[in-house]
Amino acid sequence: MKEHHIPKNSIITVAGTVGVGKSTLTKTLAKRLGFKTSLEEVDHNPYLEKFYHDFERWSFHLQIYFLAERFKEQKTIFEAGGGFVQDRSIYEDTGIFAKMHADKGTMSKVDYKTYTSLFEAMVMTPYFPHPDVLIYLEGDLENILNRIEQRGREMELQTSRSYWEEMHTRYENWISGFNACPVLKLRIEDYDLLNDENSIENIVDQIASVIHDNQKK
């Protein structure tokens, strides 16, 4: 295993749509670097299953819950001095999910305004620790849908294809304008963490390059 040049206090965040493989990369990368993980706790979310059954009723509750949980995670990461790989970014909540439901009318304008005001007060400040790099996982929609089906979460399988199509499009639009921190784009078709040990080494090299280039600015 060759030496990497990623600072031990780095914060690396993995972003991308549902089913794209964020958790797998987060765990594999953290193990390779000797970092801690910050994982999305799907099973303990009191609103998620209710949300999938009734978007309009539960979208605001769910987004406030996510915002609070992710902010607490950021605080933990900051207080620990970094050295974390994080599954999903706090930026996706407002840039993708809350905005999508506001646009579709499944979150009221008042709730959306309240949510975005809270997000900006908590996150978009100089005091908030932004990641050293955001890894954006992208891939063909059909491959992502196959992964969702193979994962077999009932609440995801009951969700319409049109929902996943719209989310896929919104993610692509969102990342094109994202500038809160440096971005590394990876296509899921280009690596296989489960069957190819060299895949993670190539990813580590790319992360080190992005962080190094940003430090020179």
UniProtKB/Swiss-Prot annotation:
Task: Give the Pfam families listed for this entry.
Answer: dNK
Reactions that this protein is recorded to catalyse: 2'-deoxyadenosine + ATP = dAMP + ADP + H(+); 2'-deoxycytidine + a ribonucleoside 5'-triphosphate = dCMP + a ribonucleoside 5'-diphosphate + H(+)
* Residues that coordinate or bind substrate: E40, Y52, Q63, R88, D93, E156
How does the activity vary with pH? Optimum pH is around pH 8.6. At pH 8.0-9.6 more than 90% of maximal activity is still observed.
| Oligomeric form and interacting partners | Homodimer.
Active site as annotated: D87
Its name, as the record gives it, is Deoxyadenosine/deoxycytidine kinase
What's the top EC group for this one?
transferase
High-level lineage: Bacteria, Bacillati, Bacillota, Bacilli, Bacillales
GO CC terms in record: cytoplasm
This protein's record includes keyword Kinase: yes
Please provide the record's keywords in A-Z order: ATP-binding, Kinase, Nucleotide-binding, Transferase
Annotated binding of ATP, by residue: G16, T17, V18, G19, V20, G21, K22, S23, T24
> What species is given as this protein's source?
Bacillus subtilis (strain 168)
* Disulphide bond pairs: none
Q: What does it do?
A: Plays an essential role in generating the deoxyribonucleotide precursors dATP and dCTP for DNA metabolism. The phosphate acceptor specificity is strict toward deoxyadenosine (dAdo) and deoxycytidine (dCyd). The specificity toward the sugar moiety of the nucleoside is less strict. Both 2-deoxyribose, ribose, and arabinose nucleosides are phosphorylated, although the 2-deoxyribonucleosides are preferred. The phosphate donor specificity is dependent on the deoxyribonucleoside substrate, but GTP is efficient with both deoxycytidine and deoxyadenosine.
Q: Which family does it belong to?
A: Belongs to the DCK/DGK family.
Tell me one GO molecular function of this protein: deoxyadenosine kinase activity
